[in-house]
């Protein structure tokens, strides 16, 4: 059976539910990732990419890398050292929500994205991915305000940080994306 982006979103919803029920901090990244994945699906459906089929494949391959790491770790099977560090950190109650998010974001982008892109567009085909790749980066960047608002609802210090930063946080938050 072919997996779809909707299947990915459903799987992320299950992770969020399980993490919420168990108090596992890994759910913060899963919730953020679900929001981003839904936005990518909306843009694929709207025809906002040069090659919608390729972007759907990229999104699925990219997401599966996270889902496989999550499943392996929580089934006591090996996963990459990078993901293991993220999941181990979810047990550290001294970390703030933002730190859990950044750990997940950096690991997923810095480890999984290049591998997924090379798998979907091997060799010289990678160059054809460029424009759509930048469109996804812009899409994710455009979600920053929405994400900050959602984060403020679950983590009250975010409200204060947002007011203090007064927009200066955007380049920092986009660091791994750009």
Regions found by a protein language model. Give the residues of each.
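Short terminal alpha-helical segments
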Residues: 1-22, 109-110, 114, 141-144
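Non-transmembrane, amphipathic alpha-helical segments
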Residues: 4, 20-28, 47-50, 54, ...
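N-terminal ordered "arm"
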Residues: 6-44
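Detector for Asparagine
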Residues: 10, 24, 43, 48, ...
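Long acidic/polar interaction regions in large eukaryotic complex-forming proteins
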Residues: 34, 38-125
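A contiguous, surface-oriented mixed alpha/beta subdomain in the mid-to-C-terminal portion of proteins
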Residues: 95-178
